[in-house]
């Protein structure tokens, strides 16, 4: 069939149908979303849960969500800006921080559902493949599916660090090792030690050492926040180990008391009826006093 020119006449515009708003804005991949939210018809009102992972310039958002007609509902959420309360105050968007955020979400969700004692996950971080096994007498493991949005799923991407943290935290997420750091596409082999180094931020530590040797000014400029907190390359692994232990000990978010800000009034308050009448009576009395004193002609 040859090339057919599209004739944009009255019939064309009359039948034209615009795409969904979020597709027009380039925010949602509906091809992937349809498959992520479509549940088996014999499961009726059982929602299909998604592990939603999104990255911004300064934060990581991890949510467990499910779809409804009126919109998505968030069951639980964890953010990288919560990590400072567990000791991680810098590098809140790297692979190690993504792992911590995923772990925090998993522990927070299981604690919310009362499953945190049954499904502890993997307490020893080795970087190897780990899958949650359901207990014999009790509820099954919480199953959800990774939702990466519009991110590129390249090998070693941070989104898989968040997923690995959630899996080690006790969530049941179908996955393989093909996209973790340490997987070699040519030999088809997975090096768990490389993955472990990324989880504990050793790739950052190696770069810190390299930059400190090559260019001291660039090192001080790029890692100024690390230097301010007294962190060097040797202290990074211990930092993340303590963070993992602290997250497991208490995943609940600390509630900060809101400061009371007294509301300012920029206009004068309206007088009551009694105040207005009193003001008029005082003015009359003052005027009569002046007349009696002969001050007014």
UniProtKB/Swiss-Prot annotation:
GO cellular component, alphabetical, reads: cytosolic ribosome; nucleus; ribonucleoprotein complex
Report TM segments: none
Task: Work out whether the entry's keyword set contains Phosphoprotein.
Answer: no
Q: Which GO terms describe its biological process?
A: translation
Cite a single GO MF annotation: 5S rRNA binding
Q: Where is the composition biased (Basic residues)?
A: 258-267
Instruction: Give the compositionally biased regions (Basic and acidic residues).
Output: 268-277
Q: Give the UniProt keywords, A-Z.
A: Cytoplasm, Nucleus, Ribonucleoprotein, Ribosomal protein, RNA-binding, rRNA-binding
Per UniProt, subcellular location reads as: Cytoplasm; Nucleus
Question: One short Pfam family name for this protein?
Answer: Ribosomal_L5e
- Could you tell me which residues belong to the region Disordered? 258-277
Q: What assembly does the database describe for this protein?
A: Component of the large ribosomal subunit (LSU).
Q: What does this protein do?
A: Component of the ribosome, a large ribonucleoprotein complex responsible for the synthesis of proteins in the cell. The small ribosomal subunit (SSU) binds messenger RNAs (mRNAs) and translates the encoded message by selecting cognate aminoacyl-transfer RNA (tRNA) molecules. The large subunit (LSU) contains the ribosomal catalytic site termed the peptidyl transferase center (PTC), which catalyzes the formation of peptide bonds, thereby polymerizing the amino acids delivered by tRNAs into a polypeptide chain.
Matching entries from PANTHER family are given as: LARGE RIBOSOMAL SUBUNIT PROTEIN UL18, RIBOSOMAL PROTEIN L5-RELATED
Entry similarity comment? Belongs to the universal ribosomal protein uL18 family.
Protein name, per record: Large ribosomal subunit protein uL18
- The organism named in the record is Helianthus annuus
């Amino acid at each position: 069939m040859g090339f057919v020119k599209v004739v944009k006449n009255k019939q064309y515009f009359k039948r034209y149908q615009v795409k969904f708003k979020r597709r027009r804005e380039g925010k949602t991949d509906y091809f992937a979303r349809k498959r992520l939210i479509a549940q088996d018809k014999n499961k009726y009102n059982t929602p299909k849960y998604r592990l939603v992972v999104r990255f911004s310039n300064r934060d990581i958002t991890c949510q467990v969500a499910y779809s409804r007609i009126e919109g998505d509902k968030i069951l639980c959420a964890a953010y990288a800006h919560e990590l400072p309360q567990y000791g991680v105050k810098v590098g809140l968007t790297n692979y190690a921080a993504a792992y911590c955020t995923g772990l925090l979400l998993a522990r927070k969700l299981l604690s919310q559902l009362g499953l945190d004692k049954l499904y502890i996950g993997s307490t020893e971080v080795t970087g190897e493949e780990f899958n949650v096994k359901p207990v014999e007498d009790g509820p099954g493991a919480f199953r959800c599916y990774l939702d990466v949005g519009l991110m590129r799923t390249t090998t070693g991407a941070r989104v898989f660090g968040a997923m690995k943290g959630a899996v080690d935290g006790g969530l049941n997420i179908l996955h393989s090792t093909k996209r973790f750091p340490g997987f070699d596409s040519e030999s088809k082999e997975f090096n768990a030690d490389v993955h472990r180094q990324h989880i504990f931020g050793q790739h950052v530590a190696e770069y810190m050492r390299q930059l400190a040797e090559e260019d001291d000014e660039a090192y001080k400029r790029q890692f100024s926040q690390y230097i301010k907190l007294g962190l060097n390359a040797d202290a990074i692994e211990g930092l993340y180990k303590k963070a993992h232990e602290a997250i497991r000990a208490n995943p609940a978010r600390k509630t900060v008391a809101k400061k009371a800000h007294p509301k300012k009034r920029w206009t004068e308050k309206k007088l009551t009826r009694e105040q207005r009448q009193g003001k008029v009576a005082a003015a009359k009395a003052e005027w009569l006093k002046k007349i009696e004193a002969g001050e007014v002609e």
